[in-house]
Each structure stands twice: as C-alpha cells, then as structure tokens.
Design a protein with these regions (language model features):
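Extreme N-terminal basic, low-complexity initiation segments
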Residues: 2-4
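Amphipathic alpha-helical
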Residues: 52-70
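N-terminal acidic leader/helix
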Residues: 6, 10-12, 18-54
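Amphipathic alpha-helical packing elements
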Residues: 71-105
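Short acidic DE-rich linear segments
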Residues: 110-112
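A general alpha-helix detector
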Residues: 37, 58, 76-80
Length: 112
C-alpha cells in the first residue's frame, strides 16, 4: 500500500463522514416540513437526502464516490441553502452551518 493510496482512503472516509453529517441535517429539514419558512427547502432537502444515501451506498460498494454524482449533490445543497434563509431557531442554525461548511469545503477542494 502506497502513501498516496492511504491518503486517498482517508480523504474518502472524510468525504463519507461529511456526507453523513449533511444527510442528518437534510433529515432535520424534512422532519420540520410543516414550518412555513421551509416551503421549497423541503423538496430540495428530500432529494438531497436521497442523493446522499446513493453516494454513501456507492462508496460502500465501489470504495469511492462518483465525482459527477458528488458534484450534483453539491449543486443540490446550493438550492437547499438558498431556501433556508427564513427558517429560525437552534436547529435551523445547526442545519445551515452544516450545509454551508460542506459547500465551502467542496468549493475549496475544487480550487486545487
């Protein structure tokens, strides 16, 4: 096993943990679907939740995530984040922070 393969495995594990965190955040949006401030965000979050599940399943089967599917997940999160601006409360803050952190991390990884 080379150093590069070990680093690649660790990066994949980190990605999977990030996707899991976001999936939990998306589930919080869906669970709070009755809040008026989440009208559009619920549909976007529901699809994002499914996309996260598919990414995690892919990683379990193939030991890696499809870069194109990962990018599509990122784009979906942009839609979700854009529709959370009027949602208030502690849960809202945690969810927004989790999603924004993921978005920033993805954008930073694409600049390299």
């Amino acid at each position: 096993m080379t150093v590069g393969s070990v680093l690649s495995m660790k990066a994949g594990e980190s990605q999977a943990k990030d996707v899991e965190k976001v999936q939990i955040a998306l589930s919080q949006i869906v669970m709070n679907r009755r809040e008026k401030a989440l009208n559009y965000a619920v549909n976007y979050a529901s699809l994002g939740y499914d996309m996260a599940g598919n990414l995690l399943a892919q990683r379990g089967i193939l030991s890696q995530m499809d870069p194109e599917a990962f990018h599509e997940f990122y784009v979906q999160l942009l839609y979700v984040a854009n529709n959370l601006s009027y949602w208030r409360g502690d849960t809202a803050k945690q969810v927004r922070t989790t999603i924004k952190d993921f978005i920033k991390k993805y954008q930073k990884s694409q600049r390299r």
